[in-house]
Amino acid sequence: MPSSLWKHCLNHLEGELDPQEFNTYIRPLQAIQQGTSLQLYAPNQFVIDWVQNCAESRINALLSHYSSGRIEKALLEVGSCSLQPQPHIQAVELTSKSARSSSRVVDRIPESRLNKNYTFDSFVEGKSNQLPRAASHQVAENPGSAYNPLFIYGGVGLGKTHLMHAVGNYIRSRNPSARVVYLHSEQFVAEMIKALQLNAINEFKTRYRSVDILLIDDIQFFAGKERSQEEFFYTFNTLLEVQHQIILTCDRFPKEVNGLEERLTSRFGWGLTVAVEPPELETRVAILMNKASIENIILSDDVAFFLGRLIYSNIRELEGALRRVIAYSRFTHRPITMELTREALKDLLTLQEKLVTIENIQKTVAEYYKIRVSDLSSKRRSRVVARPRQTAMSLSKELTDHSLTEIGKFFGGRDHTTVLHACRKINELKSIDRRMAEDYHNLLKKLST
């Protein structure tokens, strides 16, 4: 009964929930009956937290309905009801057999191209990347079965590639014989074109359909390239049929990439799609402190927070600014102080001061949500105004040095508790509402260009 009961619940929930939420938090749950309860095993704590906050009461109601009252509630726990050996071991053994049967094919497997510096240990975790990090680690522990494919999307320089390499390095550290291949989508296209020119397309197909783990970066570059999409489509299907892990990254949600065929974007949704958001201030500071320690540099809190507020939407640019400060310190033989930091980044500071003001934030938010700037300072409380107002307050706190009280004055004289509530509300929504997270990310990009 448990499997059919849970299947009924799944079918019902799939019709009620947003597809992204269902695939991310509900589909991965595994069910087994325990007395008058149904034990639901989740891959990680983040899934449990979401289910408890957003779906637990509905699940309990459905369980009671479909079991005629025999099952009273669901119990949530991190784990798996499977007693089978770790899937990653099985997958590697499977491909090892095929490898022994044809050493010529193995010789054609491309090199891994993994960056050894990109590991889970070197990845700085924060609220903005908790779910992608947890999902990636789950895939590394159970490749081919946890989430397949794993699709990670987000802006440039937010850690997508780092997570992808971290999975590959983790798997290789546990099983050196695993055939893990990383490449950029443009490289896939270039190699396919060369194979066509050399009349060696069959060899090309064999190379990428014989790997254990395929990691492809920036799949938006497949857009408009019909032959490349066709080849990748069949490679994708072949690997999934034998439960070999695929991880893909993109700069936006897959269905928003113009020129990608529907048959591809629909398959990307078979596994798990997660977004990497721009890191919050505390995470940016932690990243800076981590990079400074690697360089044996002691970075003061005031300098770290100054840099974290200065650059907020791109980790690569953040690290680049730190490298400039360190280099300037070494060239001038002076310690890293606020004064030196301002000297080293004076051109960037001049540009930022022109761009990021509360007035500019209000104008950008108003244009984005198609409301008047004056609405943000008005007493109107309708949702069409309240949510943009809260968003603008949150952006003002993140991107400027103004206090909560000062920010409130720009929004109709609201007090600091109202601003604080707005910031907390937006942070909460970003973690559970994909549309809110995308809106916030888009606004950050607009304000940083």
UniProtKB/Swiss-Prot annotation:
Q: Where does ATP bind?
A: 157, 159-161
Keyword set includes Zinc-finger? no
GO MF entries: ATP binding; ATP hydrolysis activity; DNA replication origin binding; lipid binding
SUPFAM superfamilies the UniProt entry points to: P-loop containing nucleoside triphosphate hydrolases (SSF52540), TrpR-like (SSF48295)
The region called Domain II is annotated at: 71-112
Region Domain III, AAA+ region, as annotated, extends over: 113-329
Give the span(s) annotated as Domain IV, binds dsDNA: 330-449
Region of interest (Domain I, interacts with DnaA modulators), residue spans: 1-71
Where it sits in the cell: the answer is: Cytoplasm
Alphabetical UniProt keywords? ATP-binding, Cytoplasm, DNA replication, DNA-binding, Lipid-binding, Nucleotide-binding
Question: CDD domains annotated for this entry?
Answer: AAA, Bac_DnaA_C
Top-level division of the source organism's lineage: Bacteria
Name a single GO cellular component: plasma membrane
GO BP annotations listed: DNA replication initiation; regulation of DNA replication
Subunit structure of this chain's protein? Oligomerizes as a right-handed, spiral filament on DNA at oriC.
How are the domains described in the entry?
Domain I is involved in oligomerization and binding regulators, domain II is flexibile and of varying length in different bacteria, domain III forms the AAA+ region, while domain IV binds dsDNA.
* Annotated function: Plays an essential role in the initiation and regulation of chromosomal replication. ATP-DnaA binds to the origin of replication (oriC) to initiate formation of the DNA replication initiation complex once per cell cycle. Binds the DnaA box (a 9 base pair repeat at the origin) and separates the double-stranded (ds)DNA. Forms a right-handed helical filament on oriC DNA; dsDNA binds to the exterior of the filament while single-stranded (ss)DNA is stabiized in the filament's interior.
The Swiss-Prot or TrEMBL record describes its family as follows: Belongs to the DnaA family.
HAMAP family (alphabetical): DnaA_bact
Protein name as annotated: Chromosomal replication initiator protein DnaA
